[in-house]
Amino acid sequence: MNQNKPTSKLISDFWKGKTSEELFERAKKVSPGGVHSPVRSFRSVGGTPVFFASAKGATLTDISGKEYIDYCLSFGPLILGHRDPEVEEVVRETTEIAWSFGAAEPYSLELAELISSRVPWAEKVRFVNSGTEAVMSALRVARAATGREKILKFDGCYHGHLDSLLVKAGSGLAGESSSDSAGISATSIANTLVLPLDDEASVERVFETEGKNIAALIIEPLPANYGLLIQRKEFLLKIVETARKYGTLVVFDEVISGFRVGFQGMSGLLGIWPDLVTYGKIIGGGFPVGCYAGKKDLLDLVAPSGPVYQAGTLSANPFGMRAGLATLKKVQRDSIYSVLDDRTKIFTDTMTKLLNKKSNQEWEAVIHSSLFWFRKKTQQPIRRIDLIPEGHKESFAKVFHTFLKNGIYLAPSGYEVGFLSWAHDDEIIAKTLEIADKALKTF
């Protein structure tokens, strides 16, 4: 019996007898590109996106009833897997409590207290609805606190789709940036400086000329939105030291890495305390939640305590707060991180061997905790986007479709990382590797 099968006749009748191809054609008539976030369109890998109907544990089920072992996991929020039983029970309870208050309530307080008690640099916490909102708000706080306007970011780090950060580096040193999207005005990015990762010297030179104008340096301490570009600790320490020398606030974007690589995220693993930090994904337990946190004096600048305005109708909604709280409590109670790390290494080591055995190119897995990224093997670690091997996108697309056809779902882009969850137990991993071994015989 398929435990993922939807029970509502009203829901299942909508797609009964339909194919993903049919639904995608209909979707393109009513939504841009047929999707509600670009990567879901399969544009990067080609083909038609699979329309999924349900999910449970480590498994996705499409509208035809076919099952897939999921290593995308909604791009990171589901560290316990789909519909973890404990979280699901809390969600069911919440339907009988409230769907939204738009008022003060105790659930956000409990989650904020848990985060603040375990994350010392998160002295105060403000919940929002997404990682993009969290970053936007954190940078607003940084500008207010410093009285400065410029923001320094790094090529290869993604911080959401706010205008000022959809910027790529130009050919010059931080001064010739261009937007990553149509519809963004030149004035929106005029105060954004962009530098390559893994280059301390460039950071120092920019601060020598612009230091007094830079409100915040923002970085993913574990860049995981353009492949997995693991940075040297020495680089991170140096840029933080340089920023603080000039009175610039340090913002760590831990929307992906927060509560994924450890309860204190990369900041805790590195022993580097940011001034402000952004979280998302895991803290909502699968619901749309983000937050920004930091030192008390900085967060007290936010309305109604201070002059920095930020608000949201559904901020701290009870579903996200209670699901996030249940997730973090279970993560904390069951000490899942070391187990997930071990499982990820076992999975990626064996999968890499299978790929290398069947493929005409040599693959390797870049891993950190329970994140992984398969790519062409290189002589040196890849820490910058300009060093990603040519042809990677095409090579990954072939692997993606080989696996998809046989019931393994990876993120549909060669530049997206994969994830394991608590639901990916030894049996699921063994089954995945068995499927991959058979699938790659026709690779």
UniProtKB/Swiss-Prot annotation:
Name the keywords, alphabetized.
Cytoplasm, Isomerase, Porphyrin biosynthesis, Pyridoxal phosphate
Q: Which GO terms describe its molecular function?
A: glutamate-1-semialdehyde 2,1-aminomutase activity; pyridoxal phosphate binding; transaminase activity
Pathway of this protein? Porphyrin-containing compound metabolism; protoporphyrin-IX biosynthesis; 5-aminolevulinate from L-glutamyl-tRNA(Glu): step 2/2
- Gene3D superfamilies from the UniProt entry: Aspartate Aminotransferase, domain 1, Type I PLP-dependent aspartate aminotransferase-like (Major domain)
Q: Name one Pfam family in it.
A: Aminotran_3
Q: What reaction is this protein's catalytic activity?
A: (S)-4-amino-5-oxopentanoate = 5-aminolevulinate
- Cellular localisation: Cytoplasm
The UniProt entry's GO CC annotations, sorted and at most eight, read: cytoplasm
Where does the protein principally reside?
cytoplasm
Residues where N6-(pyridoxal phosphate)lysine occurs?
281
Cystine pairs annotated here are none
Coiled coil, from the record: none
Cofactor list: pyridoxal 5'-phosphate
Give the top-rank taxon of the lineage listed in the UniProt record for this protein: Bacteria
Q: Might you give the EC number(s) for this enzyme?
A: 5.4.3.8
Alphabetical GO biological process terms: protoporphyrinogen IX biosynthetic process
Family stated for the protein in its record = Belongs to the class-III pyridoxal-phosphate-dependent aminotransferase family. HemL subfamily.
Oligomer status and interactors: Homodimer.
PANTHER family listed in its UniProt record: GLUTAMATE-1-SEMIALDEHYDE 2,1-AMINOMUTASE, GLUTAMATE-1-SEMIALDEHYDE 2,1-AMINOMUTASE 1, CHLOROPLASTIC-RELATED
Task: Please identify the protein, giving its name as recorded.
Answer: Glutamate-1-semialdehyde 2,1-aminomutase
